[in-house]
Amino acid sequence: MRKDGPACRRRSLCGPTFLLIVSVCAGTSAEGLPPLPAQVMSASPLPPLPAELSPVIPLPPLPGSAAPQPTTSFDVGTTIPQPWLFGNGDEPLDGIRPRVLRRPIGPRTAPEPVPTPITFPTRWRTPVDPPIGYTGKSSVMPVETQQDPHFVPVEDRWRTGYSAWDRYDKGHPRNDDYPFLPGRRFDPFNQNVIKGDFPIIGQHTFLDVTASYLSFQEFRQVPTATTPFESTARPNEQNFFQRPNQFFSTNFFSIAFDLTHGDAAFKPADWRLRLVPTFNFNNLSVQELGVVSPNVLQGTSRTRNFWALQEAFFETKITDTSSDYDFTSIRVGTQPFISDFRGFLFADINRAVRIFGTRNANRDQYNLAYFRQWEKDTNSQLNTFNDRRQNLFFFNYYRQDFLVPGYTAQVSVTYNNDPRSFKFDNNRFLVRPDPVGIARPHEIDVAYLGWAGDGHIGRYNLTHQFYWALGRDSLNPLANQTQTINAQMFAIEGSYDRDWARFRASFFWSSGDRNASNTHATGFDSILDAPNFAGGGFSYWNRQQIPLFGVNLVQRLSLVPNLRSSKFQGQSNFVNPGLILPNLGADFDLTPKVKMFNNINFLWFESTNALETFLFQGRIARHIGTDLSTGFEYRPLLSENVAITMGASTLIPGQGFRDIYNNQNSRVGALFGGFLAINLLF
């Protein structure tokens, strides 16, 4: 069959047409396009185009010369006629290109620029929960940026957030226990930046601000001498010892600022600054003249106030001595210090330089301190800025788990240099020297060698203390001559815990002077004690200051009957009767909020020779009496923020006490004391 229709002709022309276009492209001399190889260019010229192609591909007229341009072959050197279709290479080919290959008609206009949107680096954030407690503002500036969603830099590691936790799935009712809750600025019960729980500068500097108020109200009965030959509070009074009733009130307001640099746990502080300004307001009301002041015109009541910078010291670490956080630090300024476990010898806040530290992974501790005592205010016992010129040196060393686990042993050496001085207190009573015998200024140099222990052996608790005092008194007022001091003291307490009860038995002994007329002073006396022993402040004998002819038979918050004018402003007196005190006690945790303390003390003088010499009395019995006391401590919030302490005590006089305080026609009766102390902390 013959296939010569129009379609067939079109198909038969496709090959030459394609060859023609390829030839035109290959033979052009446009810049950058190399000519075809000579084998191709030397081929036979193309045959004439059929007539039917003219309307399909119209050819533009050739500009310039119509003669074809010869083309030289690269390898043969023969010339062939250049097809007229190629022209001279300068003419546009849009006329022969298909429509899809032609250039746009007219000049192309540049599109208007599209503004580039402002972009910020993408940050991946995780949900941020508030930190627990009141953290305040952070002073840590961020220095890192987040680079990927797997790591969120948190420069302030103290203020990490915690999610709210409904521990018991109760739907968060009021007044329930929920951890990880945000706090408030003045919330003392949860974590707070002003309590030192979060740093205020950087990540290692903390500020702890503690405001405290202590209100102490006391009713007491003590033997009170009057002045029957000068003036009395009531007419027709003839007895020497009159109405014993007294009421004492004292109130302390203080704010403690404690700035510490270091870590919050384990590692000791690098440095520390502490300031505690304190204000006191006190009042004493009695029923006899000559008590609040030797001037009877001052009446029977006295009100005083006083403020002091009670604590002010700077502490810094000298060195780290081991990888177990052992250290050596130094503290300079007015600071608290207790010489032993129970405060038998010295417990005070005063001006000092103290070096202290630990050894053997905190198993050993040591103190080396020098105190230069400030003078005390008479009625508040706060520090003044007057130099007393008394020098004290302390060295003690503690060893934990000594012999048995849970038992700590201590050895100590203490030196007291109290030079000559003459002092009237703020109430115009003579306190140095003691107004007994030959009241002349004298100097005391005495050293105390101590051995103590505190802890438990199995289920039995044990505390003991021994002191040996050796030294010299240049002129004892009572003995009226130089004294060589050689006196001792011993105390021991054992207790047993049974569930919520503790049963105690203790014994205290201080040597007495058996001959006040010789040159050997053998009655033990402390420096400035505050013993927590045999009932402590709940006991009548311990708490009350029992006056006796210008001095005191026993000092306030002391056990030793030292015939001293004042524990806080007087000098030690080693010519005294001494004391024997056995004790039985029982403490009960009635509830988690209420504790009960019960004690019974039996009191004897170790020797009465010093009393007989002082009172010009023939014979005084040794039995002082029986001291009964009970007390309660109530903490309604189960913390120290609110603590209420109350106690009641009585002294049933023995024959020795009656020999001293009986009137000519009457006997001294039982003496009572009761107190209420409210301590508020924030």
Q: Which residues fall in each region the model found?
A:
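Bacterial N-terminal signal peptides
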Residues: 15-25
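N-terminal periplasmic/intermembrane-space "pro-region" immediately following the signal or transit peptide
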Residues: 27-270, 276, 499, 503, ...
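Structural signature of outer-membrane beta-barrel channels/translocons
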Residues: 202, 214, 258-264, 315-319, ...
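Membrane-embedded beta-strand positions of outer-membrane beta-barrel proteins
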Residues: 209-213, 273-277, 330-332, 366-368, ...
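Surface-exposed loop and membrane-interface regions of Gram-negative outer-membrane beta-barrel proteins
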Residues: 231-251, 261-327, 338, 436, ...
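Signature for the C-terminal beta-barrel architecture of outer-membrane proteins
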Residues: 324-326, 335-521, 580-582, 589-592, ...
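C-terminal structural cap/anchor segments
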Residues: 514-623
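Outer-membrane beta-barrel "beta-signal"
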Residues: 630, 668-682
